[in-house]
């Protein structure tokens, strides 16, 4: 019990808690005093009903804060431990009397009841800001973690403005009245671009009501009435362009601090090796700067990424709960692009589709609103069609029929097989699927948006047979594993009103919201265990734009993520942002560019799993493909392709190009 109490005491550090201003309990935490009073009245651990009744009555005049209510179980445990301490101290070393023994038994039973009790519903019922927020559609439709985001935001604004949480929520509702779009959402004032306006409104109201009593009815645990630093100074929100400039300067200074001593040491080493040659020292210094620049920048970024969480806490992405299923308004297609080379590859693709379907069964009995498709191509060939390929397509259709008969008999088909025919590519001199994976996804987006199926030689069963069009497209690789619940969370994030893309003044890039939401990618334990090499690279975080470390950093700092090819796409918004922006036969690695044009978010709390190469050669081929693709993004920094590329996107592209030479630079610096 003492260990539990000590752990709970740590939670007291995350915020200021009101204390009583006068009386016998002056200076004591209000929630702790009230919890002890309740335990004394009940003669032991109070039941959930007693807790609700007691604190409801108290809150008629003096509402508790969200933090106080969340700490009620901890305060009740603390109160019982104080009672236990009093019993032990008064008994001394002698035997316990009958009365004290009974009291001790009651306290121990009370501690056990507190451990076993479920306070979640009690905490929800007692939270007055939560009751008020329940009237907001965006709050009530959100999942529990997102609702906690709203409540935490209200508590932080309350601390910052010295207004009560009830006042913060009331003012957020007032600001949302009579508005349309995002600004009609209460969450916009609490979590998004409406927050500065809310803070200004609360401070203006505070000036008008100066001299009235604090809504909490309790003073803050400070010795004076002086305002804190965060209240004295207005918080200036930097633009992403300013953040990029500051980070670039900071990285340059860090790299210089690391590189200058190394260059000086190299110069002295050169003088020692070539004492007769006056240029030896200079050459050693120049070579050290050239080959040490990339390692120094890598180290600077590593330091920067390590320090950033200290200054800026990551903000999770809001999500809908989707308690009743996806619904037709959020109709989603899950697509797996594959290369069909044999009968085995067809069967593996069907098995992958079945696994994704089964992983989605946690939130909808018939998975209403979500469908699954194999997006297939044949390998490049000197011929438009080859012998045996028609049989592979027929096998795929048979397997799709089998899946539909097993999982959706009598209903509309949920599984589909789409296959593109080869077209001649004059640049490569072969027949191939247009633009490979990018072209396949682009064709599927057109099909899902307006029923255009002209690129597909096989569309079985017809994916456009329903009047309703798909709203979202989830793209996964053939070796991607989607855990149970991941699809629901992805769709919930994409469908949340605060994440829906908003285009202002006819722009092609969203000003608010996101066209793509990319999950966190991790290596599967099976692929990591295949070889020592796979185990070694499965945990790499490095400087590549597709790595977890870089994705976390970009999201925490710029509130934009990196798209690595897996994620959920808002179909209409993506087509508006990306269509016509990437010329054909120019880009091999297109995911980063698409994320830049369409504005991608990063859902760090939604994890999908991917396989890793088990040997050096496949890994090196993948790195070589990524390197070529990254270098092909260089033209997007200049006209005419840079339309829609902002400062953050330029930083991402330059970062990847810089990281592409990291391995060579590290090796050269090591040899030097």
Predicted regions, residues:
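Short helix-terminus and kink motifs of transmembrane alpha helices
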Residues: 48-52, 297, 301-305, 488, ...
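Active-site acidic catalytic loop and adjacent metal/ATP-binding pocket
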Residues: 1-45, 49, 472-474, 480-485
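Transmembrane-cytosolic junction motif
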Residues: 302-319
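Internal catalytic domains of large membrane-associated glycosyltransferases
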Residues: 96-238, 242, 315-643
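Alpha-helical bilayer-embedded segments of polytopic membrane proteins, i.e.
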Residues: 73-87, 234-304, 519-523, 563, ...
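ATP/Mg2+ or Mg2+-diphosphate-binding catalytic cores
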Residues: 1-8, 60, 87-102
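Conserved helix-loop functional segments at active or binding sites
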Residues: 4-15, 40, 44, 60, ...
């Amino acid at each position: 019990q003492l260990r539990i109490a000590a752990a709970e005491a740590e939670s007291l550090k995350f915020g200021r808690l009101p204390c009583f201003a006068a009386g016998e309990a002056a200076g004591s935490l209000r929630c702790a005093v009230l919890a002890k009073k309740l335990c004394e009245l009940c003669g032991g651990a109070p039941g959930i009903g007693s807790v609700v009744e007691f604190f409801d009555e108290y809150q008629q005049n003096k509402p508790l804060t969200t933090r106080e209510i969340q700490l009620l179980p901890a305060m009740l445990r603390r109160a019982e431990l104080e009672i236990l301490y009093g019993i032990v101290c008064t008994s001394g070393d002698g035997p316990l009397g009958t009365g004290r023994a009974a009291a001790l038994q009651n306290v121990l039973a009370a501690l056990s009841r507190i451990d076993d009790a479920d306070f979640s519903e009690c905490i929800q019922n007692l939270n007055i800001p939560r009751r008020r927020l329940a009237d907001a559609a965006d709050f009530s439709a959100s999942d529990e973690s997102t609702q906690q985001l709203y409540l935490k935001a209200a508590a932080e604004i309350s601390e910052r403005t010295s207004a009560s949480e009830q006042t913060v929520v009331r003012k957020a509702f007032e600001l949302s009245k009579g508005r349309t779009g995002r600004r009609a959402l209460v969450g916009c004032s609490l979590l998004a671009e409406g927050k500065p306006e809310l803070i200004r409104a609360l401070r203006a109201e505070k000036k008008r009501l100066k001299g009235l009593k604090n809504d909490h009815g309790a003073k803050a645990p400070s010795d004076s009435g002086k305002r804190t630093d965060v209240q004295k100074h207005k918080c200036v929100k930097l633009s992403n362009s300013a953040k990029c400039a500051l980070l670039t300067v900071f990285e340059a200074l860090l790299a210089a601090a690391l590189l200058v001593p190394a260059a000086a040491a190299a110069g002295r080493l050169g003088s020692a090796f070539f004492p007769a040659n006056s240029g030896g020292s200079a050459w050693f210094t120049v070579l050290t700067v050239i080959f040490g620049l990339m390692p120094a920048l890598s180290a600077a970024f590593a330091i920067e990424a390590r320090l950033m969480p200290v200054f800026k806490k990551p903000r999770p992405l809001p999500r809908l709960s989707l308690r009743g299923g996806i619904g037709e308004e959020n109709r989603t297609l899950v697509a797996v692009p594959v290369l069909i080379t044999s009968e085995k590859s067809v069967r593996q693709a069907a098995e992958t589709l079945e696994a994704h379907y089964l992983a989605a069964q946690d939130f909808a009995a018939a998975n209403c609103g979500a469908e699954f498709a194999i997006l297939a191509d044949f390998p490049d060939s000197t011929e438009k069609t080859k012998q045996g390929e028609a049989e592979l397509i027929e096998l795929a259709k048979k397997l799709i029929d089998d899946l539909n008969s097993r999982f959706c008999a009598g209903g509309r088909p949920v599984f589909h097989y789409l296959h593109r025919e080869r077209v001649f590519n004059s640049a490569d001199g072969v027949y191939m699927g247009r633009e490979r994976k990018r072209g396949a996804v682009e064709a599927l987006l057109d099909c899902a948006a307006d029923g255009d199926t002209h690129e597909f030689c096989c569309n079985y069963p017809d994916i456009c047979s329903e009047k309703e069009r798909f709203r979202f497209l989830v793209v996964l690789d053939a070796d991607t594993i989607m855990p149970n619940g991941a699809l629901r969370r992805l769709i919930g994030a994409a469908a949340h009103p605060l994440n829906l893309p908003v285009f202002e003044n006819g722009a092609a890039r969203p000003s608010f919201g996101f066209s793509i939401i990319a999950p966190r990618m991790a290596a599967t334990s099976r692929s990591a265990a295949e070889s020592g090499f796979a185990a070694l690279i499965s945990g790499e975080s490095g400087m590549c734009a597709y790595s977890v470390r870089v994705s976390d950093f970009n999201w925490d700092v710029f509130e934009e993520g990196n798209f690595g090819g897996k994620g959920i796409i808002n179909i209409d918004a993506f087509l508006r942002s990306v269509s016509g922006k990437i010329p054909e036969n120019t880009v091999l690695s297109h995911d980063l560019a698409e994320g830049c044009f369409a504005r991608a978010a990063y859902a760090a709390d939604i994890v999908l799993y991917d396989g890793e190469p088990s040997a050096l050669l496949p890994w090196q081929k993948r790195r070589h493909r990524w390197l070529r693709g990254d270098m092909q993004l260089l033209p997007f920094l200049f006209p005419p392709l840079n339309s829609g590329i902002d400062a953050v996107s330029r930083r991402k592209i330059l970062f990847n190009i810089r990281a592409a030479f990291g391995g060579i630079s590290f090796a050269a610096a090591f040899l030097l």
